[in-house]
């Protein structure tokens, strides 16, 4: 009954085919035993009915054995070619009447009418008529990373199972329409992730777009400018102008005001990395894992779609001599900014940050901290507070920003990090009371006013630029901020009012007054305005320190990697330009020369500006 039904179907089909062959004798009988082992063309020919293999171009009505033959017939017979003067660009399949401008377009359009699907997907085996249809379909596989469900063979490869496709490496189409191959089996890829190549270190400055990964660390000086080429070139020119001004002594390294004005155009332009160097330590916080998918392989270090733009070396920082000179000038500017830290950070509340990269320091500076943390306790990567001791806590005079920039501590070696000057719970000269006050004061402490000359001297804080406190003990303790603030809060309110009225005068801030006697609106406005000014001043100082450290790190990195032009090569490159300048009387020479000095000097004697520029010899000298 039901079993012989399939056998009867081919017989009826063959009888009908025989009748058609007797009438027209044009269509051969279909193959009697077509199986899945034949080619795709044979499969399609066995599945496609005879009505779909009939040419419907005008009144042709010719039948063909397979879709390939029908397609070739339409292209050669009805479409024609320009070389044979029979090119037809209008589709006449039934009532289509689609007109194109090229032969390739009409031949691609004909695939819509012909049941020909030569483009097969490697992943699922589905066939398509046109290559653009296959390309759109393959992108769906690229979105789900061609991963099978976790329930299928999880015990084989730990959940990272790719579908086997005829022993070929899985591939996908990227967003640019190009075929990409996946990683090898010994490098399982992260799901739903693309991996960008590491940035090259053979160039000078490179510009990048803001990355998606927040833990990126770059070895070069990057610019977080918008994608526009003008903004990247403008930032590059500003850095070069700063190097030029520093080399020509247009900026006084000992003047904080001049340094601040010269660094103001660079604020917000340089991208300060916030993670460790790739060569020292790799930190990556994985995303929440999905069920059945194992995360492994290298972590992505950068936005996959971020483009990198490389520019040549700055003209004013090409040679080794230029880099050494700029590094020395930047060091002097950094010392000047350090010395002005007491005035810039006065009255600004700075707490220990929650960044778990606090163990990394790029320069001689205390551990990382940031301003504005409510509790002042270090927070681990899991979001919980970690145990802390008095030796690891940061005081307000040793705080830093969240990007690793030192806040107040000078770069001098007057106070060592590992010597007996550093505080620790087991210090012999520390009593339990002083130890408790230094520990609690470094965690929670009020903000200090802008200027406290009498109080700071009375309580033992030093007014020198080294910011080293003086106590009755022999130890130079660096936790003076907590001690000073705790001692300031100890006297009663009446004593503070008496001292305010008789001793301090207008320079001392007002003591706390009863809320019933004070005007809340005026006090809140005055405090908010003063706090805003102090915070803006601190932000400017902090940004200056960030820019200086970034520039100095960039210069030192180039010196370590020997990314500079040799002196002899630089002389040969600038020999023609120097000859032209000498002939024209050096119109662009800005070196400081004495008006009595001759225009041309002796060949054997160096110029006064030899420390800034190499000596260029003329061929006739």
From Swiss-Prot:
Post-translational modification: Activated by C-terminal proteolytic cleavage by signaling protease (probably palB/RIM13) at neutral to alkaline ambient pH.
Primary subcellular site in the record, as a coarse category: cytoplasm
Alphabetically ordered keywords of this record: Cytoplasm, Metal-binding, Nucleus, Repeat, Repressor, Zinc, Zinc-finger
Pfam families, per database record: zf-C2H2 (PF00096)
Bias-annotated ranges (Polar residues): 400-421, 433-472
Feature: compositional bias, Basic and acidic residues: 565-608
Cysteine pairs bridged by disulfides in the record: none
Isomerase recorded as keyword: no
Gene3D superfamilies in UniProt: Classic Zinc Finger
GO cellular component: cytoplasm; nucleus
A GO term, aspect molecular function: zinc ion binding
Signal peptide: none
Similarity comment: family membership: Belongs to the pacC/RIM101 family.
Protein name: pH-response transcription factor pacC/RIM101
Organism whose genome encodes this protein: Hapsidospora chrysogena
């Amino acid at each position: 009954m039901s079993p012989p039904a399939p056998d009867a179907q081919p017989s009826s089909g063959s009888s009908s085919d025989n009748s058609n062959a007797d009438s027209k004798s044009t269509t051969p009988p279909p193959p009697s035993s077509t199986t899945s082992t034949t080619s795709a063309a044979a499969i399609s020919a066995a599945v496609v009915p005879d009505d779909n293999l009939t040419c419907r171009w005008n009144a042709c009505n010719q039948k063909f054995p397979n879709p390939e033959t029908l397609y070739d017939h339409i292209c050669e017979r009805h479409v024609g070619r320009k070389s044979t003067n029979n090119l037809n660009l209008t589709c006449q399949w039934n009532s289509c009447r689609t007109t194109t401008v090229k032969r390739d377009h009409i031949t691609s359009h004909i695939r819509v009418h012909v049941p020909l699907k030569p483009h097969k997907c490697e992943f699922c085996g589905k066939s398509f008529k046109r290559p653009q249809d296959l390309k759109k379909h393959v992108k769906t596989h690229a979105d789900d990373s061609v991963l099978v469900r976790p329930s299928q063979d999880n015990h084989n490869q730990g959940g990272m199972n790719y579908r086997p496709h005829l022993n070929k490496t899985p591939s996908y189409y990227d967003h640019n329409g190009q075929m990409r191959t996946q990683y090898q089996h010994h490098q399982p890829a992260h799901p739903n992730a693309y991996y960008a190549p590491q940035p090259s270190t053979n160039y000078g400055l490179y510009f990048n777009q803001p990355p998606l990964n927040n833990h990126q660390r770059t070895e070069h000086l990057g610019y977080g400018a918008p994608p526009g080429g003008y903004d990247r070139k403008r930032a590059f020119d500003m850095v070069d102008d700063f190097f030029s001004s520093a080399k020509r002594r247009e900026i006084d390294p000992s003047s904080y005001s001049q340094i601040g004005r010269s660094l103001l155009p660079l604020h917000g332009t340089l991208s300060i990395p916030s993670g460790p160097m790739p060569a020292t330590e790799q930190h990556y916080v994985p995303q929440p894992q999905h069920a059945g998918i194992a995360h492994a392989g290298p972590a992505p270090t950068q936005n996959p779609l971020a483009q990198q733009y490389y520019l040549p070396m700055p003209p004013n920082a090409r040679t080794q001599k230029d880099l050494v000179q700029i590094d020395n000038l930047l060091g002097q500017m950094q010392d000047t900014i350090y010395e002005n830290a007491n005035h810039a950070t006065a009255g600004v509340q700075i707490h220990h940050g929650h960044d778990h990269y606090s163990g990394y320091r790029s320069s001689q500076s205390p551990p990382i901290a940031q301003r504005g943390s409510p509790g002042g306790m270090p927070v681990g990567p899991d979001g919980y507070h970690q145990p802390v001791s008095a030796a690891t806590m940061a005081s307000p005079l040793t705080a830093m920003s969240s990007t690793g920039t030192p806040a107040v501590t000078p770069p001098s070696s007057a106070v060592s990090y590992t010597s007996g000057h550093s505080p620790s719970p087991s210090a012999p000269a520390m009593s339990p009371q002083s130890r408790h006050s230094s520990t609690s004061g470094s965690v929670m402490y009020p903000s200090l006013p802008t200027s406290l000359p009498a109080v700071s001297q009375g309580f033992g804080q030093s007014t020198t630029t080294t910011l080293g406190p003086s106590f009755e003990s022999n130890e130079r303790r660096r936790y003076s901020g907590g001690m000073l603030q705790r001692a300031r809060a100890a006297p009663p309110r009446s004593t503070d009012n008496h001292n305010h009225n008789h001793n301090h005068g207008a320079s001392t801030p007002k003591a706390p007054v009863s809320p019933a006697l004070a005007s809340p609106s005026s006090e809140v406005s005055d405090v908010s305005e003063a706090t805003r000014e102090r915070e803006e001043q601190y932000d400017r100082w902090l940004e200056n320190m960030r820019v200086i450290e970034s520039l100095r790190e960039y210069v030192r990195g180039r010196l370590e990697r020997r990314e500079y032009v040799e002196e002899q090569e630089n002389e040969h490159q600038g020999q023609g330009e120097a000859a032209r300048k000498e002939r024209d009387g050096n119109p662009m020479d800005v070196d400081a020369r004495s008006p009595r000095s001759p225009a041309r000097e002796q060949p054997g004697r160096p110029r006064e500006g030899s420390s800034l520029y190499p000596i260029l010899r003329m061929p006739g000298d």
